Amino acid sequence: MQKNIQFLRKLPIPMDIKAQYPLKPEYAAKKAICDKEIADVFTGKDDRLVLVIGPCSADREDAVLTYIHKLAEVREKVKDKLIIIPRIYTNKPRTTGDGYKGMVHQPNPEASEDMLEGLIAIRRLHTKAIEETEFFCADEMLYPENYRYLSDLLAYVAIGARSTENQQHRLTASGIDVPVGMKNPTGGDISVMLNSITAAQHSHTFLYRGWECVSSGNPLAHAILRGYVDKFGGSHPNYHYEDLMGLYKDYSARGLQNMAVVVDANHANSGKKYAEQPRICKEVLHACRHSSDIKSIVKGFMIESYLEDGSQKVCEHVYGKSITDPCLGWEKTERLILDIADLI
């Protein structure tokens, strides 16, 4: 008998949570159109860029929805150049295991963990974003078994730097129908990321949520460059011209489908200096103008932004200010979105 774990309660299966907050038929039809548009970017049929943009973590429903409504206002101004995919990141990997782990753990960041309420809260938030703004959003797949709770709502899925080498993440990604971005690991080994993409693009038989499953492979699995950390804990970028050319060479050698990279402008690429994100995006666009190879694989950016600049402790209660990594505030975010559209 195991003594170090308690099984508290059986949680509802995804079908039950989906029935509680269903995707209405009219939005299912709109999602099919949205999915096609985003897929066309990653397959090279559409020369727009995607912006996966939003808070580091979705900490409270009202502030996240306020932010997404602001994105909806900007969307009309840039729709010919950009496809905006809001980030609603509802579960957060923690380097040491401590700290806020996201809405799926704590729908109220100041209350005790409640994963039943968390599963309901994340489904409700994604559904509200769709119904109020017609945005289908992105989330990080921290727990592969939880993906099914949101599988009909998400337009984009990210695999984090600490998860990209994990077999269950790779195999689950191979059965997902929308683009899945694989981040380079925290140590920076690009081959690990490319191995992850290779695995996700192939068919597999595997165990998932108590079932024996067969996936067909995800041709839209692709790379995310997020910088890396050396053995001393120092941050190093990997978005420069030389990095992108090196990725193009290594990617090409793999013979993978739909070569694509999204550049994460924060994390180790910025050294978590959130105000550097506009400069980083502009440098990558400059590289695209100077190399057709780089331009052919750069499909967009991942940007951390919220209503207010910076970050805060949970107890400070500043509306729309991150309680995890520092984010770009709204005024700078709007300016950046418009600038990116102008530079394409």
Regions found by a protein language model. Name each.
Residues 1-45:
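N- or domain-start disorder-to-order transition segments that initiate the globular core
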